[in-house]
């Protein structure tokens, strides 16, 4: 089993941190046929997969890279060609359908329908999005190697299908080493989620959109952005397509070039997300400043000069929160930080996204409680009532503005006011 993953020379020079991750992954998959690689935003998980694929090709092995979205199929295919990997694409009626080639980039939906192919290694990109079709492919190929890739493999029950977790470098270490941008978070003191029900561990979408998609709050969100992030390239996460469109109109009304993007932007009678892909490319090329989406941009979105992430919605999901913040953390020359505007009170509810620990995959039984115990900080951050900076629990004097509040009970504030969140002070 182990000879498939020997440390052969590669043509592309990896960064030292990528070499470390690749070596750790090799060590794990030598003894586990079903492994999940947990690697943070911007670490080049696709590039690491490419190195494994190049080694496998030398041993005449067939490889399949599986994506759950069409734009990720196109993005991965482009990366493979840039690295000299000739491949086919199995996705709808894609023009690059060359099934005889030993490497294929596939959409999980199409592959499941045409699962007559024989591969030695499967890569599941963004494995936190784990469909029944993924399970079907696993079941139909018991002798193959499977490598899941994710920055946030927190999906309940994932450990029932994968036996090992490879987690070489925590996100906090990546920020300390300046591999990722540092971040500050501004968040609201209160938000009214009264009556918003919880379904499958997160807020019910219809209820959430009704609570959040209000003209006053929409205006507050744009006002706050103008005050704190006017010159920053920005991603906004909304509660629904209608909410996205209202936010877009509000930004445009203020003279800010903004566009909303959603999963329905397909050219008529085709599977290709031409409309959505064009919007992403225009955003990448600075044709407009603010892009707005529900969940379409939480995974596989690699525009590195984003320096502001706005949560115009709320969530109880650590995975969604970490994914969203991660969209703004990729390293980019000339940018040192990312500003997070948390209008949903997420940070005060869950904690800072670089403080969650993850020690094993959730098998739906014991792992769930163990990970949650490790993930959630004992004390949660609070907002400075003076400057909006979110500070850690236990920190009284604000490191941003120097304000030290008196000990008083809850203070009412308007739902649009943001407060900078601060981290917990270390005991001497």
Q: Language-model features: where?
A:
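Conserved helicase ATPase core of P-loop NTP-dependent helicases/translocases
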Residues: 89-99, 245-246, 256-294
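A short beta-strand element within the Helicase C-terminal
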Residues: 119-120, 289-314, 320-327, 337-342
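Conserved pre-motif I regulatory segment
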Residues: 2-38
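Conserved segment of the helicase C-terminal RecA-like domain
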Residues: 327-357
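Conserved Walker A/P-loop ATP-binding site and its immediately adjacent core
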Residues: 46-48, 57-80, 241
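Conserved interdomain linker/interface between the two RecA-like ATPase lobes of SF2 helicase motors
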Residues: 168-238
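Post-DEXD/H (motif II) to motif III coupling segment of the RecA-like Helicase ATP-binding lobe
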Residues: 129-185
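Walker A/P-loop
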Residues: 31-52
């Amino acid at each position: 089993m182990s000879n498939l993953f020997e440390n052969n020379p590669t043509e592309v020079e990896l960064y030292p941190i990528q070499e470390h991750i690749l070596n750790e992954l090799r060590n794990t998959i030598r003894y586990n046929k079903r492994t999940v690689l947990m690697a943070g935003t911007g670490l080049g998980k696709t590039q690491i997969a490419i190195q494994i694929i190049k080694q496998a090709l030398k041993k005449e092995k067939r490889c399949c890279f599986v994506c759950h979205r069409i734009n990720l199929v196109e993005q991965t295919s482009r990366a493979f060609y840039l690295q000299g990997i000739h491949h086919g694409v199995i996705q709808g009626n894609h023009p690059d359908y060359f099934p005889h080639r030993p490497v294929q980039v596939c959409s999980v939906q199409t592959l499941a329908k045409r699962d007559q192919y024989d591969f030695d290694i499967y890569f599941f990109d963004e494995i936190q999005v784990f469909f029944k079709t993924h399970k079907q492919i696993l079941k139909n190929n018991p002798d193959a190697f499977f490598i899941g890739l994710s920055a946030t493999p927190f999906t309940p029950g994932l450990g029932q299908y994968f036996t090992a977790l490879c987690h070489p470098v925590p996100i906090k270490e990546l920020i300390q080493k300046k591999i990722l941008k540092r971040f500050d978070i501004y968040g609201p003191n209160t938000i009214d989620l009264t009556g918003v029900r919880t379904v499958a561990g997160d807020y019910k979408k219809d209820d959430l959109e009704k609570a959040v998609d209000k003209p006053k709050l929409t205006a507050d969100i744009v006002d706050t952005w103008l005050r704190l992030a006017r010159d920053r390239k920005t991603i906004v996460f909304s509660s629904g397509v209608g909410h996205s469109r209202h936010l877009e109109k509000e930004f445009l009304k203020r003279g800010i070039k903004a566009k909303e993007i959603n999963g329905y932007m397909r050219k008529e009678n085709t599977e290709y997300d031409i409309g959505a892909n064009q919007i992403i490319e225009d955003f990448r090329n600075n044709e407009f400043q603010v892009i707005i989406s529900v969940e379409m941009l939480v995974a596989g979105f690699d525009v590195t000069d984003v320096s502001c992430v706005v949560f115009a919605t709320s969530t109880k999901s650590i995975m969604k929160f970490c994914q969203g913040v991660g969209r703004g953390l990729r390293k980019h020359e000339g940018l040192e930080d990312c500003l997070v505007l948390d209008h949903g009170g997420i940070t005060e509810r869950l904690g800072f996204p670089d403080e969650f620990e993850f020690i094993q995959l959730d098998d739906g039984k014991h792992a769930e409680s163990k990970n949650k115990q490790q993930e959630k900080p004992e004390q949660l951050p609070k907002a400075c009532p003076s400057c909006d900076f979110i500070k850690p629990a236990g920190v009284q004097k604000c490191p941003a503005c120097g304000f030290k509040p008196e000990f008083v009970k809850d203070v009412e504030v308007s739902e649009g006011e943001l407060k900078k969140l601060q981290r917990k002070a270390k005991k001497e």
